[in-house]
Curated annotation (Swiss-Prot):
Key words, A-Z: Chloroplast, Plastid, Thylakoid
Protein name stated in the entry: Unknown protein from spot 19 of 2D-PAGE of thylakoid
Keyword Thylakoid: yes
Superkingdom of the organism of origin: Eukaryota
Note: On the 2D-gel the determined pI of this protein is: 5.6, its MW is: 24.0 kDa.
GO cellular component: chloroplast thylakoid
Localization in the cell: Plastid, Chloroplast thylakoid
Source organism of this protein record: Pisum sativum (Garden pea)
Length: 33
């Protein structure tokens, strides 16, 4: 059960990161470029 919860949490974080990157393609990691 815990593994399933972590998998869902990881997937949700990945989806949020992709959405954020889509909205701010050039400003995701400005200090690392």
């Amino acid at each position: 059960v815990l593994n399933q919860y972590l998998t869902e949490l990881y997937y949700q974080v990945e989806a949020n990161n992709k959405s954020y990157a889509s909205n701010n393609e050039l400003a995701v990691f400005p200090d690392q470029r």
